[in-house]
Amino acid sequence: MSSKKKQNYLFSEPETTVAQSIILVIARIVFGFMFMSHGITKWIIFKDMTETFPDPIGLGPTLSFWLVILAEILCSFGFILGALFRLSLIPMIFTMCVALLFVHGGDPLTKIEPAISYLTIFVLMFFTGPGDFSIDVIMRRMK
């Protein structure tokens, strides 16, 4: 019988080496800021896009627009810091799935390549975790 405490996968982190953690933090910073830049751009042109923004899941263009901005800015911030890491990734993954399947579904590869790239990185990061240099791991170790 194992004496280990059962951990919730959503909040547990696998052990990583220093080199792996460095690579993960670099990936979080690079892809997090790249993804965040899309949200900041949308926020800047908010007034021009609210009525014309795609609404593939029927929430209305304004609400869909706000949810995408939330995923691209706020969740990117959590992704970069490694704070509520997997929880932050869920809206980011969902946003990229919707963009890929519904918004850009019939577009050529050159148009859907960013969504495929982000989706791939986000899914991989969901399963690897944020690495040792993250708020989640630091908070867990302080307990």
Residue ranges and their predicted role:
Residues 1-44, 62-70, 77, 81-143:
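Extended, low-polarity transmembrane helix blocks
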